[in-house]
Amino acid sequence: MTNIIRQFLRQEAAGGLILIIAAAIALLMANSALQGVYQSFLDIPVSIKIASLDISKPLLLWINDGLMAVFFLMIGLEVKRELMEGSLAGRDKAVFPAIAALGGMLAPALIYLLFNGADEVTRQGWAIPAATDIAFALGVMALLGNRVPTGLKVFLLALAIIDDLGVIIIIALFYTQQVSLQSLGIAAAAIALLAYMNWRGVGKTSAYLLVGLVLWVCILKSGVHATLAGVIVGFMIPLHTQDQRSPSESLEHGLHPWVAYLILPLFAFANAGVSLQGVSLSGLTSLLPMGIATGLFIGKPLGIFTFSWLAVKLGIAKLPDAINFKQIFAVSVLCGIGFTMSIFIASLAFEGTDIALTTYSKLGILLGSTTAAVVGYSLLRLVLPAWRKAVNVR
């Protein structure tokens, strides 16, 4: 396993543990005497005014639209690297996790629609259980230390990256509301400039980020979700230049600690604080949260494992070396941890609707993700080999 992937896995695992702490603090604050402090923090007004440009939003939306764009920038960099040189480079490496990820998105969405397909409003949340939170999943996996084979970690990483790419496409196609053609036109010009810079071999990361900032503002104003700007910029930054530098790798290396230890935990803190006041058992067991929880806990492993098994049996893909189907099933349960990505989609799906929909959707996400984490961890403990003693070389 390359040093890049090894470092990535370490940071994601540690970041996942911080995510858990941030979410727990948010839940405690939202259901204690500190609820007012918590809400006031999220409602802090933040404005940027440059000439005729005026962007005014509460802190919560700056986190969701701004900081999450940085997260998606890193996702774009990761996906490009893995497609060109990493665990997804070449057909043989990419097919197995790609098919698994496809099943892991389709089955949860279909199960959700079985619960909520008849309701025009809640139907909009069909993509909520389709997401996997890679940081959380790797954080749980890290609890088992060196018992986890390297190939299994890389499989989870590749599957989650493809899953992220699928979620990005879903956001672009299904969660875009009113569109400003003027802003989209300027955004298209910015994308064309980024593509030209890439073609000409421009290696200055700052130049891409400056154009990317313009792109972010244009996409934000266009009505398309602004986080997509991050993905586009990530794909446009060169992986290598003529002088053998890697602007993409350098930026990813610099961003990763900020994303793992600050941006995602801050997003979790800002969005996981669900007030349980007024929440009833009948509401918690209603179709919306049950559809999400069932989609995550049942749909994810059903889709990932079934599609993986069929791909191998039909000769479409090969099972990675030193991995068996018991381990694949355990990891597929772990992929039911949707958390940050699912909460992000829920905020888009039910934006401007009854606040109760967002509340119960988050509760469904927490229920499904927690169950998947506990059961997935327990299954991994059963199917993985015994602890391997570390060998010190002197």
UniProtKB/Swiss-Prot annotation:
<feature type="transmembrane region" description="Helical">
    <location>
        <begin position="254"/>
        <end position="274"/>
    </location>
</feature>
<dbReference type="GO" id="GO:0005886">
    <property type="term" value="C:plasma membrane"/>
</dbReference>
<keyword id="KW-0997">Cell inner membrane</keyword>
<feature type="transmembrane region" description="Helical">
    <location>
        <begin position="213"/>
        <end position="233"/>
    </location>
</feature>
<feature type="transmembrane region" description="Helical">
    <location>
        <begin position="328"/>
        <end position="348"/>
    </location>
</feature>
<keyword id="KW-0915">Sodium</keyword>
<feature type="transmembrane region" description="Helical">
    <location>
        <begin position="179"/>
        <end position="199"/>
    </location>
</feature>
<keyword id="KW-0406">Ion transport</keyword>
<keyword id="KW-1133">Transmembrane helix</keyword>
<feature type="transmembrane region" description="Helical">
    <location>
        <begin position="14"/>
        <end position="34"/>
    </location>
</feature>
<dbReference type="GO" id="GO:0015385">
    <property type="term" value="F:sodium:proton antiporter activity"/>
</dbReference>
<keyword id="KW-1003">Cell membrane</keyword>
<dbReference type="Pfam" id="PF06965">
    <property type="entry name" value="Na_H_antiport_1"/>
</dbReference>
<feature type="transmembrane region" description="Helical">
    <location>
        <begin position="95"/>
        <end position="115"/>
    </location>
</feature>
<keyword id="KW-0812">Transmembrane</keyword>
<keyword id="KW-0472">Membrane</keyword>
<dbReference type="InterPro" id="IPR023171">
    <property type="entry name" value="Na/H_antiporter_dom_sf"/>
</dbReference>
<comment type="function">
    <text>Na(+)/H(+) antiporter that extrudes sodium in exchange for external protons.</text>
</comment>
<keyword id="KW-0050">Antiport</keyword>
<comment type="similarity">
    <text>Belongs to the NhaA Na(+)/H(+) (TC 2.A.33) antiporter family.</text>
</comment>
<keyword id="KW-0739">Sodium transport</keyword>
<protein>
    <recommendedName>
        <fullName>Na(+)/H(+) antiporter NhaA</fullName>
    </recommendedName>
</protein>
<feature type="transmembrane region" description="Helical">
    <location>
        <begin position="59"/>
        <end position="79"/>
    </location>
</feature>
<keyword id="KW-0813">Transport</keyword>
<feature type="transmembrane region" description="Helical">
    <location>
        <begin position="363"/>
        <end position="383"/>
    </location>
</feature>
<feature type="transmembrane region" description="Helical">
    <location>
        <begin position="125"/>
        <end position="145"/>
    </location>
</feature>
<dbReference type="GO" id="GO:0006885">
    <property type="term" value="P:regulation of pH"/>
</dbReference>
<feature type="transmembrane region" description="Helical">
    <location>
        <begin position="292"/>
        <end position="312"/>
    </location>
</feature>
<feature type="transmembrane region" description="Helical">
    <location>
        <begin position="154"/>
        <end position="174"/>
    </location>
</feature>
<dbReference type="InterPro" id="IPR004670">
    <property type="entry name" value="NhaA"/>
</dbReference>
